[in-house]
């Protein structure tokens, strides 16, 4: 794959730096070969280590990992580059450090807004020796409460070994949001009069009792009022099906990239240095919603009844070109005539079946077409209408996207010459991934599980806008992507998480796994994952820790995102909102080098 606008390895251009959240993930990876510069030291080395403990990282970031800045004299520039956001309610930071031989230190701070925050305080001296035993020092970051402002803090630590000329400077960047404190309410005249009456032994008890009574009543009323407002807001929020504006604006197509038509697929164990899985939040899915597949329990009459409210007359649909065709299913480019004004027309996709389709196949098409029904988001493509008239083959109508199926589009891009202006760049591919992650993040918030996320179940238009659609007819149109493992059900084995393969369990976490494979599809321009692996061996293969290898010219930071999605434990996979943030930051970093 030739590098487009992204400046990837092998392109000869500048390489974009990893975004902040990826820097943190990379900093927590197990150390491989010592590529980071070491502390200036004597030949034996002082063996200095400085890090945030697992408890401290969990308190600040919610991650179960230690964050090393220096490990046995090796400096982690990934970790030092991360500008850590300190929660506004957190006033203390704790650093763990030690050295095996004499190392002198000098500690200093810089704050960009002294009105919002005073100079940080520490419980150690400003200069001295790094302790020889494992020790913790505390940094206090207390706001003044005078203004609302984000404060940037720089902690500079100079480490000196053996002589004053032999030193290393470490800069730790932090930022914290400080808020203005509410002013205390001044005592009113009524309060003053009341304060004088409390010395009256006759009226003291009744007056205090009355005040407490009225205050209690007022507080109760206020609480009831607030609860009512909150319930009303939550109800309105759940009823509104608004499009969430959490995807970034589309980036334009630029200099193209092409990829060789063949690529030798390699597979790596998850614990090898080039395929290590970064640590992610263990609390990513506090309550996993697990579903079992029960489509075969629905009858054709029940399936038609569920879509009766969006049924339209067959006369309003005109079928044009056949876009895709399988054994029993077809997708047409269609025209939908407006019900009130026959002169108004809309272009549509029309999914339907051939005459030889069985009742089970028709039922499955209707049922799976309803997967995204009623959901509204710019990166989702739910059905809008159906035609279920007697004597006619059922039809499912969806909005039209003029570049069609994403998988077919990617494979077409692979055949395009490198100098073709319509070829897409790496930045465009990342932008597509962001859009898919945004749509899936919306589904996760609505507790909707897709079960079959893949490039084949997405569509794209000429502005490179991508939308996720259902998987109706996908088994028929992409038969090589589905396999039956002896249970009489065709499943997308190569896209499925281990718990889905073994226990037929699906959740938002299993959708995250499929997203990682979809991201791999994007970076390989539509290649098939695990193409050399027997579908019956996939579960054992994944259990042993093997994963698909890093695509050619795929940046390490982007492959780290994929690896996060393929953690065996569903709880350790990132949430879609975290993936949106990671990919958006990486997309911005690519754009900075265009």
Swiss-Prot record:
Is detected in all the tissues. Highest levels are seen in the ovary, lung and placenta. GO terms for molecular function: ATP binding; frizzled binding; protein kinase activity; Wnt receptor activity; Wnt-protein binding. The active site is at residue 452. Glycans are attached at residues 123, 158, 162, 166, 193. Keywords: ATP-binding, Cytoplasm, Glycoprotein, Kinase, Membrane, Nucleotide-binding, Nucleus, Phosphoprotein, Receptor, Signal, Transferase, Transmembrane, Transmembrane helix, Tyrosine-protein kinase, Wnt signaling pathway. Residues 240-594 are cytoplasmic. It is a single-pass type I membrane protein. Proteolytically cleaved, in part by presenilin, in response to WNT3 stimulation. One of its GO terms (biological process) is midbrain dopaminergic neuron differentiation. Residues 1-34 form the signal peptide. Residues 50-178 form the WIF domain. Disulfide bonds: none annotated. PROSITE patterns: PROTEIN_KINASE_DOM, PROTEIN_KINASE_TYR, WIF. It is found in: Membrane; Nucleus; Cytoplasm. One of its GO terms (cellular component) is nucleus. Interacts with DVL1 (via PDZ domain). The extracellular WIF domain is responsible for Wnt binding. May be a coreceptor along with FZD8 of Wnt proteins, such as WNT1, WNT3, WNT3A and WNT5A. Involved in neuron differentiation, axon guidance, corpus callosum establishment and neurite outgrowth. In response to WNT3 stimulation, receptor C-terminal cleavage occurs in its transmembrane region and allows the C-terminal intracellular product to translocate from the cytoplasm to the nucleus where it plays a crucial role in neuronal development. This is Tyrosine-protein kinase RYK. It comes from Mus musculus (Mouse). The lineage of its organism: Eukaryota, Metazoa, Chordata, Craniata, Vertebrata.
